[in-house]
Amino acid sequence: MVLLVVDTQKGIVDERLYAFEKFVSNIRKLIRTAREQGIEVVYVQHDDGPGTGFSIGDDEFEIYSGFAPLLTEKRFVKTVCSAFKKESGLLEYLTEKGEKDVMVCGIMTDFCINATVEAGFEHGLHMIVPAYANSTQDNEYMTGEQSYHYYNEFLWPNRYADCVPMDKALGLLKK
């Protein structure tokens, strides 16, 4: 198993996210537990391209300090919603390692997390989504809360991922 931390970058990790404090706390617990158990933590960062303010070299592109990777932890960069798009190299990396179980956390629920969960499933990976370890902001169609519940409680379970309570997620990391 690997813990995949998606798009937790300075420019978008803030109070605009649904259930912000719980989200931050849960991701910190997941990262800490994975490291304690010797489970690899892998980071993915979204790059909107040069001149956007959200690209390699920009401060907003960097990982939020509360989730900062260790120097030894892998980072992948993507330019589309799915972390598994060929250009990122993530799928090839996991395939070479023989990893099939991916616990995913991060942002945005309705964009990059959804695309990553569905693409991972389509590539034959067992996707695990811990409760309140993904979040998003309000948009013109749904609040962040509505988006969170739609994906975590309706769309992903029994289709694309095992959506599990935090205590179960932590237990899976401890096996």
Residue ranges and their predicted role:
Residues 16-47:
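A short alpha/beta connector and helix-capping loop motif
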Residues 9, 47-48, 81, 108:
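Catalytic metal-binding/acid-base residues of hydrolase active sites
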Residues 9-15:
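Short acidic, Gly/Ser-rich segments with clustered Asp/Glu that frequently serve as metal-coordination loops
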Residues 51:
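Phosphate-coordination/substrate-recognition cap region in phosphate-metabolizing enzymes
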Residues 1-2, 29-32, 54-175:
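Active-site-adjacent betaalpha module
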Residues 4-7:
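N-terminal nucleotide-binding beta1-loop-alpha1 segment
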